[in-house]
């Protein structure tokens, strides 16, 4: 199926997990608390989690764009009142393409491209 794919990833999460696992888990919970409702509000569906990464799909281009902007805005506002070590910074990759959802997994070139765009 052709759909809009969002791939998010927390910057520095792997290093933070090695340095302070409790803080990493605390920030991940806060990350999820901020991001999940925004995706849902914009009619997206979270289809996969890979540690600190979220893969979501959307049916409309404006919804995935709105969701991305709202996520970055919410995190920017949240980070203003936190020290550098407690900031949540994410990268987001977006793509429109063909994916296959099977057994709670996402496959296909569309997924691969979105995940490869995210680090850029």
Residue ranges and their predicted role:
Residues 1-70, 74-77:
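Catalytic NTP-binding/metal-coordinating core of nucleotidyl cyclase/transferase enzymes
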Residues 55-120:
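Catalytic beta-strand-to-alpha-helix segment of the class III nucleotidyl cyclase homology domain
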């Amino acid at each position: 199926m052709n759909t809009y794919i969002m791939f998010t990833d927390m910057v520095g999460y792997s290093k933070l997990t090695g340095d302070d696992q409790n803080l990493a888990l605390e920030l991940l919970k806060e990350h999820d608390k901020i991001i999940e409702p925004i995706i849902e509000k914009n009619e997206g569906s979270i289809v996969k989690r890979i540690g600190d990464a979220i893969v979501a799909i959307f049916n409309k281009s404006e919804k995935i764009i709105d969701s991305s902007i709202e996520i970055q805005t919410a995190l920017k506002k949240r980070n203003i009142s936190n020290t550098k070590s407690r900031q949540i910074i994410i990268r987001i990759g977006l793509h429109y393409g063909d994916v296959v959802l099977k057994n709670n997994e996402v496959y296909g070139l569309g997924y691969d491209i979105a995940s490869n765009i995210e680090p850029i």
